[in-house]
Amino acid sequence: MNIGIYIYDDAEVLDFSGPFEVFSTAKRLANNDWQVSLIAQTNGPVNARGGFSVNPHYSFADCPELDVFIVVGGDHTHELEKSAVIEWLIHTASTTKRVASVCTGAFLLAKTGLLCKKNVTTHWQDQSDLAAMFKDLTVIANKRWVTDGKFTTSGGISAGIDMSLALVAELINKEHALLTAKQMEYAWL
């Protein structure tokens, strides 16, 4: 199973490192064939928030077909304006079995039109902006994550860990998600 996490300049570090750790730990504990990777528009380093530099495993050009696709948040405003990014998000999210966003990554997924008429969430501070920009969404407050069909969106930053554990529960089982959380010494549920 290929799990891909989309990153970009000024992405929130915990938005991608938290889910990466959850899926990597779940893989190790299950001894399964999951491949967890970071994907960026190009193969060059990505400068996340706080100057954190990270090298993606893949670019848009060489990214394998994904089974689970996660779009992270951060300062997403420039990404919303990039037609190549939005087109790639549309293609990738349309061909992936499970699609998720962390924090303001919901804005990027909403821009694709694929969240139309869906229940979603995002960081508490951005919920009113998401609802104002994308009037065809139902923005749910006070939830760590919301699932509607194949789409799961999470609240801000650390909520991506909770959402990722929920996806592990769905993909393997709840016991394995609880074991993953315990291994990470993370209080979940």
Each model region followed by its residue ranges:
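Structural detector of well-ordered beta-strand residues that form the stable sheet scaffold
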Residues: V99-A100, T121, I140, T152
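Extended, subdomain-level signal for the structured scaffold at the beginning of enzyme domains
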Residues: M1-V99, A106-K111, K117, M133, ...
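The feature captures the short pre-catalytic strand/loop hairpin that immediately precedes
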Residues: V139-T147
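Short, glycine-/small-residue-rich phosphate/pyrophosphate-handling segment
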Residues: L114-A132
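Conserved beta-strand segments that form the floor/walls of ligand-binding pockets within enzyme
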Residues: I70, T121, V146
